[in-house]
């Protein structure tokens, strides 16, 4: 009996150490990613890996998660403005979290349990795409908040929007604005017009359901709304005033 308890205790201790070490390794990888990707091109994201593995498991071997990294100088200014107009107009001002939007989302979700509203900023979306996974859970949101804080402390806003645009999903297997521009408009990201940029931004809430190459009435309406918001924000002057161009 003593031997059994001793062996069980030893196994429990080993498991605890394994868990602690695994957690430390993951945290270390995230910290390294925050530091390295503050200046290095991002080769792939967690969401890209998830999509690719899921496709393989389903036997969809023709699926390829594709992305082409481009610098901010090689992306049309309208594209950066479009995603901010669509997803996070307070992006230059906040430190990763839009408190007002969070409050509004909580009130909305209390009244409407069937249609949940999110309040994630571009910083949070970028962190989720780069380091984490899809889905709604308090664990993921907690990790997202912690990593977002680290990113906002280390990265510039220009870097955050650059990485966001390079890893955002714009359709099945289409990741990053360069791949999207090539796929849907047969041009480089630097040549995108305001209308094309707004169309790409319009599918971001759900790029699997919404298609830039076959936009629904809702997507077209959203595109037009984004274009109006871009004008109201001040166009290219908004980017210059916030050191984002």
UniProtKB/Swiss-Prot annotation:
Pathway the protein acts in: Cell wall biogenesis; peptidoglycan biosynthesis
Pfam families assigned: Transgly
Single Gene Ontology BP annotation: regulation of cell shape
Catalytic activity as recorded in UniProt: [GlcNAc-(1->4)-Mur2Ac(oyl-L-Ala-gamma-D-Glu-L-Lys-D-Ala-D-Ala)](n)-di-trans,octa-cis-undecaprenyl diphosphate + beta-D-GlcNAc-(1->4)-Mur2Ac(oyl-L-Ala-gamma-D-Glu-L-Lys-D-Ala-D-Ala)-di-trans,octa-cis-undecaprenyl diphosphate = [GlcNAc-(1->4)-Mur2Ac(oyl-L-Ala-gamma-D-Glu-L-Lys-D-Ala-D-Ala)](n+1)-di-trans,octa-cis-undecaprenyl diphosphate + di-trans,octa-cis-undecaprenyl diphosphate + H(+)
Record's bilayer topology term: Single-pass membrane protein
Name this polypeptide is given: Biosynthetic peptidoglycan transglycosylase
Keyword annotations of the record: Cell inner membrane, Cell membrane, Cell shape, Cell wall biogenesis/degradation, Glycosyltransferase, Membrane, Peptidoglycan synthesis, Transferase, Transmembrane, Transmembrane helix
TM annotation in the entry: 24-44
Gene Ontology MF: a single term: peptidoglycan glycosyltransferase activity
Keyword Coiled coil: no
GO cellular component: a single term: plasma membrane
Keyword Ribosomal protein attached: no
Job of this protein: Peptidoglycan polymerase that catalyzes glycan chain elongation from lipid-linked precursors.
Main enzyme class: transferase
Family, per entry: Belongs to the glycosyltransferase 51 family.
Enzyme Commission numbers on file: 2.4.99.28
Major localization listed first in the record, in broad terms: membrane
Organism: Pectobacterium atrosepticum (strain SCRI 1043 / ATCC BAA-672) (Erwinia carotovora subsp. atroseptica)
InterPro entries, sorted: Glyco_trans_51, Lysozyme-like_dom_sf, PBP_transglycosylase, Pep_trsgly
Subcellular location(s) per record: Cell inner membrane
């Amino acid at each position: 009996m003593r031997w059994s308890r001793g062996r069980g205790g030893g196994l429990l201790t080993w498991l605890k150490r394994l868990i602690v070490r695994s957690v430390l390794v993951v945290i270390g990888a995230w910290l390294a990613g925050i530091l390295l990707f503050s200046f290095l091109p991002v080769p792939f994201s967690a969401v890209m890996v998830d999509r690719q593995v899921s496709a393989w498991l389903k036997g969809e071997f023709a699926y390829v998660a594709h992305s082409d990294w481009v610098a901010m100088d090689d992306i049309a200014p309208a594209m950066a403005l479009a995603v901010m107009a669509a997803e996070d107009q307070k992006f230059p001002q906040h430190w990763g979290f839009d408190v007002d939007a969070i409050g509004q989302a909580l009130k909305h979700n209390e009244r409407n349990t069937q249609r949940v509203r999110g309040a994630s900023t571009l910083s949070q979306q970028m962190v989720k795409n780069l380091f984490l996974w899809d889905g709604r859970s308090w664990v993921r949101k907690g990790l997202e908040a912690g990593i977002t804080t680290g990113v906002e402390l280390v990265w510039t806003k220009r870097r955050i929007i650059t990485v966001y645009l390079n890893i955002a999903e714009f359709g099945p297997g289409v990741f990053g604005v360069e791949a999207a521009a090539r796929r849907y408009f047969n041009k480089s990201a630097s040549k995108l017009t305001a209308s094309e940029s707004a169309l790409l931004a319009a599918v971001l809430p759900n790029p699997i359901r919404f298609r830039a190459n076959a936009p629904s009435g809702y997507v077209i309406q959203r595109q037009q709304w984004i274009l109006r918001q871009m004008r109201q924000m001040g166009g290219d002057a908004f980017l210059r005033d916030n050191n984002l161009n």
